[in-house]
């Protein structure tokens, strides 16, 4: 009994020492890149860091070879992709996203009706769009009609037509009405006030005169008629398709160049290893 007590104590000390060594090796493996293997039959540990010389036990070498074969047979994980394949995936996603956005842009373009015929928008918006599209026709028509309007109001004020009660009825401020009453140039100011009040009517007359003038000029060949909406949209679609195809070819060329560069880098790294 006295001989067995020290033997058991020595065995326990040996086991605790081996367990501590195993724990240290596992903790070290967490912070370094390498392959850590434990032989189950005996407490033999083989640690093989990447690209470093190591001393292995004969029984652990066989276990290490088997483990390497198993790791080579396993498919690579998603998070551990090689650099070339990772860049290829990113470039392909960029090409697909750019093509999808460019294909969506022509379909999003809506048909824009003629502002002279579109009555769904307000009068001011119609006047503004007509000015952008038919400015060369609208400006002379607007100047002529505005002169006629102002001349009519001025002639009425000279002939003694009292417009001040009408202005008071419309709700103009008293300061403006007093200026029109007491000013020496009351006729001109009265005509101008009536001219500004009649702005909606003036815009309507201008748009009507512009549409009539445009039709007259087109019928006599002085102004080119716009193409039908379908043909216009088809032409724009063909132009956008050509631009998209050119951009796709450029992106494909860039992608192939980058893939070749990455392949060369990967092959060079493999040769060095």
Curated annotation (Swiss-Prot):
UniProt domain DUF1279: residue ranges: 118-230
Protein localization: Membrane; Mitochondrion; Cytoplasm
Pfam families named in the record: FAM210A-B_dom
Region (Disordered): 95-116, 247-273
Keywords linked to the UniProt accession: Coiled coil, Cytoplasm, Membrane, Mitochondrion, Transmembrane, Transmembrane helix
InterPro entries hit by this protein: FAM210A/B-like, FAM210A/B-like_dom
Listed transmembrane segments: 138-158
Extent of Basic and acidic residues compositional bias: 106-116
Coiled-coil annotated spans: 233-272
Superkingdom as given in the UniProt entry: Eukaryota
One GO location term (cellular component): cytoplasm
Membrane topology qualifier: Single-pass membrane protein
UniProt cross-references to PANTHER family, sorted A to Z: PROTEIN FAM210A, PROTEIN FAM210B, MITOCHONDRIAL
Record note on quaternary structure: Interacts with ATAD3A.
Entry function: May play a role in the structure and strength of both muscle and bone.
UniProt similarity note: Belongs to the FAM210 family.
Identification of the protein by name: Protein FAM210A
Species per Swiss-Prot/TrEMBL record: Rattus norvegicus (Rat)
Protein encoded by which gene: Fam210a
